[in-house]
Design a protein with these regions (language model features):
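Lipid interaction determinants
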Residues: 2, 10, 22-148
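Sec-dependent N-terminal signal peptides
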Residues: 8-18
Length: 148
C-alpha cells in the first residue's frame, strides 16, 4: 500500500513542482532602477519651479510586456501615454503617444514635451536620475519620485 502511494504521489509532486518552477520563471521582473515614477526637473528652457508647479512626471511602473513599458505621463493638464522600449547600450525608442483632450490655459510645457518625447533615442540612469536625450543634444532630466 505504501509503495503504491509513493508511486502515485511522487510523479504528482514532480509535475506540481515543475509547474511551479515554470510559472515563476515566466514572470517578468521589474527593473527597480528604471521602472519607477520620475519627476521632470530639467527640460527645454522651462524652470524647475514651472516643472514642479505642473507636477510634471513620467510613470514607468507598469510591467514590461515583450520588452516594452507603457509610460504614463502628466505635464499639468492632460494625461498622456506612450509605449517605451529601453534597450541595452543606453538606447530607447518611444512611440507616438495618445492623450486626453482637455483645453487648459497654459499648455506650453505639455505641447513641447509631447513633440520632443518621441525624438528621444538615448537614456541613462545614474543614481536617482534618469536622462533622456536625442541625437541633437536635447535632453530631459528626471529625478526618482521616491528619492528624498
Amino acid at each position: 500500500m505504501i509503495i503504491r502511494m509513493k508511486k502515485i504521489l511522487l510523479p504528482l509532486f514532480a509535475v506540481l513542482l515543475l509547474g511551479l518552477v515554470l510559472n515563476c520563471s515566466s514572470v517578468s521582473a521589474k527593473d527597480p532602477f528604471l521602472q519607477r515614477q520620475w519627476m521632470l526637473i530639467s527640460f527645454d528652457g522651462f524652470s524647475k519651479d514651472q516643472l514642479i508647479a505642473n507636477n510634471a512626471e513620467m510613470n514607468l511602473t507598469a510591467n514590461r510586456v515583450k520588452g516594452k513599458i507603457q509610460a504614463r505621463v502628466y505635464m499639468g493638464c492632460n494625461r498622456m501615454s506612450f509605449v517605451s522600449e529601453f534597450k541595452k547600450g543606453g538606447k530607447v525608442s518611444i512611440s507616438k503617444g495618445v492623450s486626453t483632450m482637455k483645453a487648459c490655459q497654459d499648455m506650453n510645457l505639455e505641447t513641447s514635451f509631447e513633440k520632443k518625447i518621441e525624438t528621444m533615442t538615448n537614456y541613462s540612469v545614474e543614481g536617482h536620475f534618469l536622462t533622456l536625450s536625442d541625437d541633437h543634444g536635447n535632453t530631459m532630466k528626471f529625478v526618482a519620485a521616491d528619492w528624498d
